[in-house]
């Protein structure tokens, strides 16, 4: 699939960070970015937009990204990556153990993010 058509769902409650990440992705050719700031909003966006990939923050205002991952995984096998400031090995290993495709800790370098989602 051409990356211009690839739809990425970005879930993070920090609006400024979401906009920055979306900008990085758009500059790299990923033009179709949809965002959500909570678990509830992410589930709605997921059902409405049917993304090809999801990037999930671990800490969200109405739940955590791990539970969201499990709900999304029940419905789809799209690639799902965690983006989190929680950099403890146990969190990273837990996320990967659930079946996440990657666990990227914040802060990250923009080229690293693009490389790891491609």
Q: For each of these PLM feature ranges, what is it?
A:
Residues 57, 84:
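Active-site residues of response regulator receiver
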Residues 15-34:
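Two-component/phosphorelay signaling modules centered on CheY-like receiver
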Residues 44, 66-76:
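Short amphipathic alpha-helix used as the core "switch/output" element in two-component signaling
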Residues 35-53:
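Acidic, metal-coordinating helix/loop segments flanking the phosphotransfer/catalytic sites
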Residues 38, 64-67:
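Acidic catalytic/metal-coordinating carboxylates
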Residues 12, 60:
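Conserved acidic carboxylate
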Residues 61, 88, 106:
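The feature encodes the CheY-like receiver
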